[in-house]
């Protein structure tokens, strides 16, 4: 196989899907056994797998804590306090709080899977067309738009249950709330549970975006049977 041929084929797959979804005649692209419905279904398969991979990566032990891209630190406005804690012999407590935050995110993120899957199932033909024709993060933006509220509602109680086990988390909320009243801390960072919930969502969508980029770069790598069907057809 010539160098770069897989990359060329990958772009051809995306081009073919766009042609199918936009209604180009099948014979015009050399395939007469695929329909626009097949193309949209193939996209849904790929996005479902991508979402599952993202959730799986983050939901495993150290999915957040062990990955610098998504690890949740203390809020920026509280990091000076963290530095003081570490300086004055409270390193263990600071580490415990940060670990608790990230473990909470790891437990919560698995709840996103059915919500993301349902968003894919509910995707309209126009949504699919927009994703195929959109930018590198068009699918990620679709997920954000359609799932953020539901995911946040699922994450928050799980995060609260986890942080409630750590005394320092309660103290953080107490003193950070007062600091926010006096303008010494950003209000969005004053509630640790809400902060962790948002950061967990940010991490999830970051990983989904990376999966989307991988799908666009190498559709065949998703394992979608319909995309394999297209790939095989253009590879003959």
Predicted feature locations:
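Mid-length scaffold segments of soluble, non-membrane domains
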Residues: 91-162
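Bacterial N-terminal signal peptides that target proteins for export
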Residues: 2-15
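An amphipathic alpha-helical core segment
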Residues: 158-204
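A cross-kingdom marker for long, charged
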Residues: 203-236
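N-terminal signal peptide c-region/cleavage motif recognized by signal peptidases
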Residues: 23-25
């Amino acid at each position: 196989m010539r160098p770069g041929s897989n990359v060329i084929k990958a772009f051809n797959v995306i081009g073919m899907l766009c042609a199918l979804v936009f209604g180009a005649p099948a014979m015009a692209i050399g395939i007469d056994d695929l329909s626009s419905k097949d193309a949209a279904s193939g996209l849904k398969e790929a996005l479902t797998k991508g979402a599952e991979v993202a959730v799986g990566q983050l939901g495993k032990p150290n999915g957040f804590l062990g990955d610098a891209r998504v690890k949740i630190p203390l809020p920026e406005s509280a990091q000076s306090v963290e530095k003081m804690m570490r300086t004055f012999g409270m390193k263990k407590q600071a580490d415990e709080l940060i670990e608790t935050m990230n473990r909470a995110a790891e437990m919560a993120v698995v709840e996103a899977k059915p919500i993301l899957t349902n968003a894919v199932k509910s995707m309209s033909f126009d949504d699919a067309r927009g994703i195929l024709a959109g930018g590198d993060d068009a699918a990620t933006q679709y997920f954000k738009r359609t799932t953020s509220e539901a995911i946040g509602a699922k994450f928050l109680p799980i995060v609260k249950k986890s942080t409630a086990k750590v005394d320092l988390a309660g103290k953080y909320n107490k003193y950070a709330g007062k600091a926010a009243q006096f303008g010494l801390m950003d209000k969005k960072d004053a509630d640790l549970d809400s902060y962790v919930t948002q950061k967990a969502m940010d991490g999830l969508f970051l990983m989904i975006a990376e999966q989307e980029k991988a799908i666009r770069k190498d559709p065949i790598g998703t394992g979608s049977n319909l995309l394999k069907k297209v790939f095989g057809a253009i590879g003959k």
